Amino acid sequence: MYTTTLNKIRLHNPCTGGWAKLLKTLGKTQADDDPVPLSLILQSNGLEDAIWTLQCLEGADREIRLFAVDCARQVQHIMTDQRSVEVLEVAERFANGQATSKELGTSRAAAQAAAWAAAWDTADAAADAAWDAAWDAARVKQAEIFLKYFGE
């Protein structure tokens, strides 16, 4: 189980609403160094705030990268360019110490080029509609994945 503290969160300038919500959930009025489970932040504030809080963790780079890869794999079936799939494989290998930062950078650049190429080919209206539907479905699954890596 991963935890952070209110003091660590405060150092990263959280949004006012999310901060107030978390303090209220914890029954506190100010920051302290008591451990706060990330799963509680997910439950209290939702996935976006829980993901934002990952920047407050130390020593969780591997899990954060694997979480990102796992979330991206949820939409891998709609990736039409092999470079996008390959960057997931390299990122996962990198997280597990099986790829170099140079390999990761090269595959990331290739995937970004693929993303730009795809973006120019997509009509804005269709993209917006698809994004909204996919976003809603993906957020539910991503909350489950978040708990897999950072829950109790």
Region annotations inferred by a language model:
Residues M1-E152:
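Short, glycine-biased loop/turn motifs at secondary-structure junctions and
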